[in-house]
Each structure stands twice: as C-alpha cells, then as structure tokens.
C-alpha cells in the first residue's frame, strides 16, 4: 500500500487544491433570487398602421404581426410583475435613428409601387393621345406637291446659246462697240440676250456696284460673252465666226450644248507663261510662225481672280502644225519686235490625267456620290438623260440643284394695266390720278398776294 500511496501523493494536498477552487463566492452556486433580479431582454416591435390602398393579404400579415407583438407584451408584463417592487417601473429604452427610419418601410415600398404603376398608365395614355393627334394632323394636312427639277428650261436655253471668248473689254464701257458686236452676230438670226462674264474689276467692291462704275482692271483687256438666239439653227450657224478679228481681238466662238470636238493630236500645251499674259499675244505669235493655222487659244484662268495660271492650250487646224510648234520650245515669246524674258515650254497635249481614285475630289467619285443621292428617286430613262446633259452643259449653280425636288407653285391670272381690282382704290378705268399739290408754289403765291393787298 505504501508504494501505491506514494504514486498518487497525499490526499491532503488534493483536498487543498479543491478548496482553493471554491474559495471565491462568485464561483459558488447561484441562488434563485439572483436569477429573478436579472431582467429579460425584450425587443419592442412598434405597431404599423396599414395604408388604405393595401390588399387583403397585406392586412392579414399585419394583423398577425400585431397579435404576436401583443402576446409578447403580455408575457413581458407577467414576468415583470413576478419581480421585486423596485423593478415594477418599466425602463424606457432609447430608440435609434435606424428604427425611426425603418418604421414604415413596407408601407413606403407599396406606395412607391402604386405610384410607378399610375405614372406608367399616364404615360401610355399620353403617348396614345399624341399618336392619335399626329395621325389626325397627317390626314388633315395636304401633302406638298413636288416635282423633280430637270432644268428643262435651262437645257432648252443652252441649245440656243453660243460662247464667245477673247471679247474686247471695251464692249462694256463703249455703247458703239457693244452695238457693233451685237450686229456681228445678229447677221445669223434674232438675238434674245447677251451676257458678259469673267470681268475683272480694279476695286474690291460688290460686282453690281463695280459694274455700274465700270472700273475695269487695266491688265485684263478681254471678257467672255454668252449670246442667246431665239432659234437653235441660228446659234449653230454662228459657229462660223470662230477666229474672226473684232476690234483687234481674235474671237473664239463655240456652241454651249454642241461644242467642237477636242483633238489632242492637233493641240499643244504651252507653259511658263506670265500670269497676266493675254490670249491675243498667243494668237498673233503662233499665227506668224505657222501661217495663220491657229484654230483656238485658251488660257486657263482662276475663277476668282480671272488671272492666268501660267499655261494655255493652243489648237491648230492641221496636225503638221503641231510638229512645227514643237520646234519653238525653250524660245522666248515675241510680241512684235520685243522678246519676253520667259522661255516657252511647249509639248504635245495629253488626255486629261485623272487624279488618284482614292481622292474624294476625283471626277468618278463625285459622279458616284451624285448618283447615290439621286438613286433614291424613281426616275425613268428620259429623266436620267436630261440630268446627265444638265451636269455636263450647265453652270455650277444649276448643276447643284438639278435632280432635286422642287415645289409646284400655282399662279393665278396676272393683272393687266387698267383692270379693275376688288378691294383696291383708284383702279377703275378712265379715272385720273390726282397729282400732289406743290406747296412751295402756293405759299409763295399767298405771300405775294398779301404784299399786294398791303400796298
């Protein structure tokens, strides 16, 4: 026994350790009184008043929650009555901000749903009313009558028009020269109108004001003219006046809608010209060197300044003249007895070199763009040919509007002189119009009469 007792130690030491565990009163047994003193934690659930627009299901759920809250309150009151008298008074717990905000969450949610439904219904009503009003307006409004602008009048006018280049500028300033110029072309038929273009002025003024003042630029002694005949055969016959001399100027005459064919085999390119070079000097120079074989001379000019770009195209009557003209390359231009410092650069004329197809300014790309805009319209073959003719013959203003839709304007009967018009005074026949009295003359007469009476 002694050996086993030595293994586990003395019993007195074990008892001492157990006594140390239960020395503290807090570690001892808990009495019932202490348990009763501790209050039970209860969460108060506020009563929620249901809105009037809630459904029956929502009302039932709210009633159940209210009954459950009432039962919990009754249990809490029973337990509080069983406690001490000092703890009978209910301790009010402080309410947090979140509880105040979340009191009516459910009611707010249903109110929001109902308001959204009402807004959707109002929007649908407004959209339906707007659609119905638009349909009614479309029915009441009459569609505007439109037609495709084919420029038929301008094309018919172009068939009777002749272009005249290198016209002396004195035609604008002198009435005698203008009359002689008109008589020259009047020999082939009656003239409807004459328009002068490519006029360069000396001052930077509006063109109408500058034309009225007739302050022309001194370095530019020629203009272009468009002569409109009353009949087409007369305009075609007037092409015979090409290369005729009028006031020491060789005229370049060509038809607008039926121009003369361009032959590159009979044409030369002349470069390194002065910007203020005149067409008449080239006429005289090449006629003197090539036995009067020049058919036409054209200096390419800037559309805004009317100054030359430094090169020209000269067309001859015979192809042999081209070979002779090439011998004049790198030789100065002679004007009478004087020689200019610039040496001419003469070469054979080539076909129009087209720019890159990637460029939007390429003629084919512009043509495709124009065709794409017109493809939306349903045009027949006759209309397409007219649009193509207008694009090739008419000017910039007409080319920009050809093929577009235009409104049809209905006009009534035009008024004539002496016709009676309702609502306008003094429109009856035979009634003279009263002239206004001259006040100065009458006042002078009265003053003279007064002086006569005084005397």
Curated annotation (Swiss-Prot):
Residue intervals of the RRM domain: 160-258, 266-351
Bias (Basic and acidic residues) ranges: 24-37, 124-141, 439-455
Any Pfam family matching the protein: RRM_1
Cell compartments where the protein resides: Nucleus, Nucleolus
Basic residues compositional bias, start-end: 339-348, 425-438
Annotated Acidic residues bias: 68-91
Signal peptide boundaries: none
Region annotation Disordered: where it falls in the sequence: 1-104, 117-142, 333-402, 420-455
Cellular component aspect of the GO annotation: nucleolus; preribosome
A GO BP annotation: maturation of LSU-rRNA from tricistronic rRNA transcript (SSU-rRNA, 5.8S rRNA, LSU-rRNA)
Record's compositionally biased regions (Polar residues): 51-66, 349-363
Coiled coil: none
Gene Ontology terms for molecular function: RNA binding; rRNA binding
Keywords from the named record: Nucleus, Repeat, Ribosome biogenesis, RNA-binding, rRNA processing
Function: Involved in pre-25S rRNA processing.
Similarity-based family: Belongs to the RRM RBM34 family.
Identification of the protein by name: Nucleolar protein 12
Protein encoded by which gene: NOP12
